A protein has these predicted regions:
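An ectodomain-focused feature that recognizes extracytoplasmic/extracellular
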Residues: 26-209
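C-terminal motif of bacterial Sec signal peptides marking the signal peptidase cleavage site
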Residues: 17-20
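Beta-strand elements of well-folded, non-transmembrane domains
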Residues: 141, 153-155, 233-235, 245-251, ...
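Bacterial signal peptide processing site
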Residues: 22-24
Length: 277
């Protein structure tokens, strides 16, 4: 009887495995609609729409017409943290990291102005949208690095001589990285920038000590980031574009108590160009 139960269990597991493998993966093509049941519990809600591999077109833009880049979505796929080498003769290099924040990492519904000047320079200026996500990544040694992935106030431009958007269009620019935590956040000792204690209650006499001053004086610094958007797919009929991006930005400073480190984020992006209403 025991062997029969074990065999039945193994058969059930094999059937379940084969059934799961036989299902075709869902591809989030931009021109298809999906039901709630297709998306639920799959993690696809964090994925950006995609364009087919055959989308290799281009479209022209008029320098006298205003445009917007809307529904911009950026989906991170890999992370790297810059670490100093133990050998002083070697330069710091980026180390691959694993994301601990699994299903809430993409930026979405971002909109901004898109203009083409008389010199053929295409400029995108981010205005609003879901333009930040709190993400934590883990290095191979176990160290965790929190950061605020964002493109707030991004101003990205192309080289001169552009007449529109094609699969060779590259947009590069800088943006700001707000503090991971706000001024009203309290640390475990109830210290904050805008509220809470000025110093640790257990050490009032040592509040001005240089070693703990940085922990007591909270700051919410605004740091910098840089991103490159490389268009690789264009659907000229609908104005849709897609491609890859690479961003390098600062990590969290724990309200000013730690030095930020550079984090490199790579991934996919999607957007749609429309004339301004």
């Amino acid at each position: 009887m025991r062997y029969r139960a074990l065999v039945a269990l193994l058969l059930a597991m094999c059937v379940g495995f084969l059934t799961a493998c036989s299902e075709e993966p869902i591809s989030l093509l931009s021109d298809e609609t999906y039901t709630y049941d297709q998306i639920r519990n799959t993690g696809l809600a964090n994925s950006c729409p995609q364009l087919p591999e055959t989308a290799r077109g281009s479209f022209d833009l008029d320098s006298e017409t205003g445009y917007i880049l809307t529904d911009l979505c950026l989906e991170p796929t890999s992370y790297f943290v810059k670490e100093e080498s133990t050998n002083k003769r070697e330069e710091a290099k980026f180390i691959g990291a694993k994301a601990l924040t699994r299903y809430t990492s993409s930026l979405d519904q971002v909109t901004g102005d898109l203009t083409l000047d008389s010199n053929g320079v295409l400029t995108f200026e981010e205005q609003y949208g879901i333009d930040f996500q709190a993400i934590t990544v883990q290095l191979p040694g176990g160290e965790q690095v929190p950061m605020l992935f964002t493109i707030k106030k991004l101003v990205a431009t192309t080289a001169e001589g552009q007449t529109g958007i094609s699969t060779s269009t590259d947009l590069t620019g800088d943006y700001i990285v707000p503090s991971y935590r706000g001024a009203s956040f309290l640390d475990p000792k109830a210290r904050g920038q805008a509220t809470g204690y000025d110093n640790a209650v257990a050490l009032p006499a040592a509040a001005d000590d240089e070693e703990i001053m940085r922990e007591n004086v909270k700051e919410t610094p605004v740091l910098d980031g840089n991103i490159s958007l490389q268009v690789s797919k264009v659907k000229s009929e609908t104005g849709e574009i897609a491609g890859i991006f690479e961003a390098i930005q600062a990590s969290d400073t724990d309200l000013g108590s730690k030095e930020p480190v550079d984090v490199k984020i790579r991934g996919l992006f999607y957007g749609r160009v429309e004339p301004k209403a």
